[in-house]
Amino acid sequence: MAARIKTFETVETRENLAVAPAPTHPELDAGTRQLLAEFRPVVEQRIDDVIAEFLQYVSAWPEMRLLTQSAEGIACLRREQGRHLLNLFSCQFDAGYFARVSRMGQAHEKAGLEPRWYLGAYGHVLKILVELAIEHCGDDAARLLATVSAINRVVEIDMASA
């Protein structure tokens, strides 16, 4: 019997995964996914800056210093947070995504980090992403509103999945 994998849109068997459409979230319509796909290269180009600002922000909090007190911890945060943010803009909410989010949650729990701290840090990342959207969209207010709305939606989905 084939193993079954549940995603947001479908239940797929291992045999048809290669040809099945990539799973996504029902709240992400085609227009939202398109905006996020267009914004992903902006994030990718500036990911090192985004992560550096994130690390500077969280290292000021005693509760977050546990994760940023060693070179190994910083390297891990830099790598994993950067990868995670870029993956969000791919809108791939599949079994791999949920496994990664689960591992991140376990790492937070193991470090004794309460949700209020990492959610607060995520709020700062959201601020940085909105700043990038402002740069990206320029004077096009309608596009900016749509892009920020798409960013908010994908971040909300991610936070709810943790």
Predicted feature descriptions by range:
Residues 45, 49, 53, 76, ...:
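Short, well-structured alpha-helical interface segments that form or flank functional binding sites
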Residues 54-55, 59-89:
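Structured interaction and signal-relay segments at domain junctions
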